Amino acid sequence: TDYTDTPLVEKGQNEATELGKTWTELKNIEIVYVSPLTRTLQTATNIFKNSGKKFVAIDELMEYPQGVHFCNKRKNKSELIKLFPHVDFSLIQEKSQYWNDTVFESVDDLKQRIQLFKDYVKETKQNNISVVAHSSFLKQFLYDELGDVHQGLCHCYPYDYKL
């Protein structure tokens, strides 16, 4: 079985659809930034279904760690464009610049990805954005810590964060 860029499980699809129906602040979101892994693209699509929001894929939002674990290796850009035609993939390259088949990225590498994303968002001057990413990435992004990714971090839940 090929575990490269694994899809979202049914439970995750249902959670995302439910959040899209119940999240009252969804209407205030200006743009949706999403990790270009299939499972997060599916999550974002289910949350923001029929909302008319713009989706932008950004490699910096991919799961930690990049490298070795093929479930975290994204498909090529050309394949993603075919699967998710409603997503803007212009900010990513054909192959991920962060992937390495034999070496895990370090926590410092992750922190650098997070800072690059924060700098990008500051430059765009948008006020209300959505970031659809992964638990390990989000825990480091929100709380500057890793560890037990389920402690205090819910799946498919909106967190407020101010840059």
Question: Could you tell me what each predicted segment is?
Answer:
Residues T1-F55, H155:
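Active-site-proximal alpha-helix that buttresses catalytic centers in soluble enzyme cores
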Residues T1-P7, S51-R113:
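Phosphate-handling substructures
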Residues T22, T43-N50, E79, L83, ...:
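Alpha-helical structural signal in soluble globular domains
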Residues E25-N28, V121-N127:
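Glycine-rich phosphate-binding loop signature in dinucleotide/nucleotide-binding domains
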Residues Y33, N127-F137:
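Beta-strand elements within well-structured catalytic alpha/beta cores of enzymes
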Residues T38, L61-M62, S136:
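Catalytic metal-binding/acid-base residues of hydrolase active sites
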Residues D109-T124:
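A short, acidic, amphipathic alpha-helical segment used as a generic capping/interface helix at domain edges
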Residues E145-L163:
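Domain-level recognition of soluble alpha/beta enzyme cores
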